[in-house]
């Protein structure tokens, strides 16, 4: 299948995509976990009783990774194949997740692929992404042709989504601050319309995973057992369920309260960078960790309206899609090519 624009938000927590299917926007999401593929899957011998996991083998640099919604969130030794480092976009895991998103969508040719990076790493790594993923790619399932790659700051995707779907809440004449609480980083952009204020925008490695690690450490201290599968803590908090740990249901709310200092530290850094907020029409809160940070952000900016995006996980990807379509249309117009 050929598409004009394919938008991918390869986050530290989940990989999200958006692309056009007729007049609709198709979206998909799976965990940003890329374990080495298992060659002897027992479920294939289950005679229809055992369900096979929804994963694809994705080849990168001679290794095969399992990618998809059915990927295991925990492993026997606590390493599920998730990468939490600032140079994540340089890794084979990142390439495998990007390849998986293209394969699950059934895409074989893309005129423009739009990718995002955290605000504080975009200058460092955007050229690498353009060079690495423009041209003919192959992840073990045939060639995929990518004609061009555009890299944008991740929160810009949410700002564009807010402008498109926020109705009258988006004020083009005044400034908004977009806060994107991701899995590993929290990024914020102050923009007047679509003009970014670099001096007031920034990012910090203080996303949701740091909170989950704190909770894991507190549980380990109480239970006197190591706790390393923070993905299960993430899932339980999202679903508002207790964590099963050696037959015991552990309520995570008190542990979340004890981890509040980590959230407050990130929000304080944000306050220091942004400065006075009298000129802001609103703060737009997005990202998979938005719910964790919302109370602290309301407390830190009590006089500014807070808009929490619906389906915040997909906000960046949908915004990337709009950015890709707009830039492609402008370039075609400049060349005198029909859109």
What are these regions (language model features)?
Residues 213-224:
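Long, charge-rich alpha-helical interaction segments
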Residues 1-176, 195-209, 222, 231-284, ...:
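Nucleotide/phosphate-binding catalytic cleft detector across ATP-hydrolyzing
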Residues 188-193:
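PRPP/pyrophosphate-binding module of the type I phosphoribosyltransferase fold
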């Amino acid at each position: 299948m050929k598409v004009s624009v394919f938008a991918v938000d390869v986050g530290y927590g989940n990989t999200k995509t958006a692309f056009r299917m007729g007049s609709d926007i198709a979206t998909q999401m799976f965990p940003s976990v890329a374990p080495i593929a298992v060659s002897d899957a027992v479920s294939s011998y289950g005679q229809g009783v055992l369900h096979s996991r929804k994963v694809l083998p994705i080849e990168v640099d001679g290794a095969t990774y399992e990618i998809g919604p059915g990927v295991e969130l925990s492993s026997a030794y606590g390493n599920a194949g998730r990468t939490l480092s600032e140079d994540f976009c340089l890794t084979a895991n990142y390439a495998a997740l990007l390849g998986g998103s293209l394969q699950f969508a059934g895409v074989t040719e893309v005129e423009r692929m739009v990718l995002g990076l955290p605000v504080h790493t975009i200058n460092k790594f955007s050229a690498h992404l353009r060079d690495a993923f423009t041209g003919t790619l192959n992840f073990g399932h045939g060639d995929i042709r990518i004609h061009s790659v555009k890299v944008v700051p991740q929160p810009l995707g949410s700002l564009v989504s807010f402008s498109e779907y926020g109705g009258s809440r988006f004020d083009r004449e005044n400034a908004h601050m977009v806060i994107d609480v991701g899995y590993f980083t929290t990024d914020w952009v102050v923009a007047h319309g679509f003009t970014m204020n670099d001096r007031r925008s920034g990012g910090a490695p203080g996303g949701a995973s740091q909170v989950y690690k704190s909770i894991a450490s507190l549980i380990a201290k109480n239970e006197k057992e190591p706790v390393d599968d923070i993905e299960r803590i993430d899932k339980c908090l999202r679903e508002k369920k207790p964590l099963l740990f050696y037959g015991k249901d552990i309520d995570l709310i008190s542990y979340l309260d004890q981890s509040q200092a980590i959230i407050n530290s990130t929000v304080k850094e944000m306050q220091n960078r942004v400065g006075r907020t009298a000129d802001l029409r609103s703060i737009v809160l997005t990202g998979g960790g938005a719910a964790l940070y919302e109370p602290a952000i309301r407390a830190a900016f009590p006089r500014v309206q807070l808009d929490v995006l619906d389906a915040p996980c997909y906000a960046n990807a949908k915004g990337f899609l709009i950015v890709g379509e707009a830039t492609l249309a402008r370039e075609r117009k400049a060349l005198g090519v029909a859109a």
